[in-house]
Regions:
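Short, glycine/acidic-enriched loop or turn micro-motifs at the edges of active sites
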Residues: 66
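Short beta-strand scaffold segments in enzyme catalytic cores
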Residues: 93-97
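Active-site glycine-centered loops adjacent to acidic/histidine catalytic or metal-binding residues
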Residues: 63, 89, 246
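Structural signature of FAD isoalloxazine-binding scaffolds in flavoprotein oxidoreductases
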Residues: 109-113
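A charged helix-plus-loop insertion that forms the helical arch/lid used to bind
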Residues: 30-41
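ATP-binding/phosphotransfer module of carbohydrate and carboxylate kinases, centering on a glycine-rich
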Residues: 1-17, 25-31, 47-58, 70-81, ...
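Conserved beta-strand elements of the Class I
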Residues: 84-86
């Protein structure tokens, strides 16, 4: 990260650096606390390390918060007061933006829905809860199920392609994924009641295979009076959302 920043031609003109990093983390101190998908990154003072080497102010926040910020300002959430962004990728993360400001929580853990318990069964993990949303409805979860049940060696996209071609096992895995993700989204809706849920992350490359069913499943899981107002849309900024949001962090932190 340091070498890449120093190689940028515009580095000398920069006034600050924003970093979107996997949570959990301490956004106030810029410390990475032990993300499930970054083994060994325990209590890493990323802000201090970067500031010492780059000699510019550095702001660190959850990568999902950064993406949420970008989508709320420039993407699918633009024009809405409250936007909850969910990334479904290697893991599952979330960020809540209200009135264009990220809601971080007392310990920088607001929106950490990946560790939300969906069921009391499921694989174990050294950091995450058993039966958590991330272990059941992430790209990694799909990849794991594809490998265990179909001996697939590719990513989640391969599983979606098999399901579209009628493979019954692949279809069952995707159906389970949709059910778990729908429960997680319904829990978010009942907790913060956002204007819109925005879905991003690598799994959304296969959105055409599951978005319609996902919307219907979510409606089945919420209060009847909420069903007509459920709004779930794919992210518009794609993989750039986190980068755009990270660039916005220093200004947002003033």
């Amino acid at each position: 990260m340091i070498k890449m920043t120093q190689r940028l031609q515009t580095y000398s003109k920069a006034k600050a650096i924003g970093i979107g990093a996997p949570g959990p983390l301490d956004a106030k101190k810029g410390i990475i606390l032990g993300p499930p998908n970054l083994p060994g990154w325990d209590y890493v003072p990323l802000k201090d390390i970067m500031e010492q080497r780059i000699a510019l102010p550095v702001v660190v926040d959850n990568d999902a918060n950064a993406a949420a910020l970008a989508e709320a300002h420039f993407g699918a959430g633009a024009g809405y007061e409250s936007v909850f962004y969910i990334t479904v990728s290697t893991g599952v993360g979330g960020g809540f933006v209200y009135n264009k400001q990220v809601i971080k929580g007392a310990n920088s853990c607001a929106g950490e829905i990946g560790n939300m318990i969906i069921t009391n069964t499921g694989p174990s993990h050294p950091v995450l809860n058993k039966g958590s949303l991330e272990l059941l409805a992430s790209g990694t979860a799909l990849q794991r199920a594809g490998k265990q049940q179909l001996n697939l060696q590719g990513d989640a996209g391969e599983l979606f392609r098999l399901a579209q071609n009628g493979d019954p096992t692949a279809k069952d895995i995707i159906e389970e994924f949709i059910n778990y993700l729908a429960i997680g989204i319904a829990n978010v809706i009942h907790t913060v009641d956002p204007d819109i849920i925005v879905l991003g992350g690598g799994v959304m490359k296969s959105k055409d295979s599951f978005m319609t069913e996902l919307r219907e499943k979510v409606k089945d899981c919420v209060y009847p009076q909420l069903r007509q107002s459920v709004r779930i849309e794919p992210a518009l900024l794609g993989t750039k959302a986190g980068i755009v949001g990270a660039a916005m962090l220093p200004k947002q932190s003033r």
